[in-house]
Amino acid sequence: MRYFTNVHDLGDLKSALAEAFEIKKDRYKYETLGKHKTCLLIFFNNSLRTRLSTQKAARNLGMDVIVLDVNQGAWKLETERGVIMDGDKSEHLLEAIPVMASYCDIIGVRSFAHFENREDDYTEKILNQFIKYSGKPVFSMEAATGHPLQAFADLITIEEYKKKDRPKVVLTWAPHPRALPQAVPNSFADWMNEADVDFVITHPEGYELDPKFVRGAKVEYNQMKAFEGADFIYAKNWACPGVTRPADYGKILSKDMNLTVDAAHMAVTNDAFFMHCLPVRRNMIVTDEVIEAPTSLVIPEAANREISATVVLKRMLEGLE
């Protein structure tokens, strides 16, 4: 596997899940695979789980790890061609990428949506420049429109905790004080559509996700109705994706606190597990009561980020041989 940016790059999900559970039993089974190989992790944005879990995964495989925070200690980077660089940006990404690539074997990139131009975000301008100009295998540690490492960990978690063969999984929008990218909900939808689940998406009008991620999923605007009989509730906020309201791309259209996941919402489910990628705004996205309940999976879900990253890096290392 040379690139990892979406669910299709991973291939057959059943074999990927089997590999994940194999690694979960013995994280160091392939500890010599990455000997004398270097993984470069490039962060344009903040990170806790992705930063720690991906470093741990690389070391599980025997790799050396270099971490670069682009906005802390590195030269400011220009990303546009044709710009007269007479401002505060000292280096162009087109030189920086091949230089960084010369020091490593595999590159991970984390770069969020900017909400300035939908086309730039949805064509994954930054991530694709690394793919085009690095000459090295590249994986996404969250890009403008997707977070596949998170979605893979989510799928592992659902597979681990499901109580029936085809559970009902609900992705629900919930309020947040800031405008957040669609990367996590996009990827979650993309992966659930490939999994053997009954998948439902619920959100206020105007928050419709891009059809290429929604695909055949059921969209229910009545949140309580969507929750009925659910086995897993996955809560996440996202700003307007600009699908039905292009002029509102990246804007906050609602802060309806009635959509916060609370005990009343969970009461209509099938004793559902609660999931969230973290970090979470308590008592906006979800109440203390729900996130602290025995059915909350946010911690094991986060722990599975190490497993998803280990599987991905293992396959990328195997592709180098």
Regions found by a protein language model. Give the residues of each.
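Glycine-rich phosphate/diphosphate-binding loop of Rossmann-like nucleotide-binding domains
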Residues: 44-62, 66-67, 159-236, 241-242
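Phosphate-coordination loops involved in phosphoryl transfer and adenosine-cofactor binding
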Residues: 33-39, 166-168, 271
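Short, structured coil segments at secondary-structure junctions
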Residues: 61, 133-134, 195, 215, ...
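C-terminal helix-to-coil terminal segments
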Residues: 292-321
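Positively charged, low-complexity intrinsically disordered leader regions
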Residues: 1-52, 56
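Phosphate/diphosphate ligand-binding glycine-rich loop within oxidoreductases
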Residues: 34-41, 47-159, 281
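Rossmann-like adenosine-cofactor binding region
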Residues: 212-289, 295
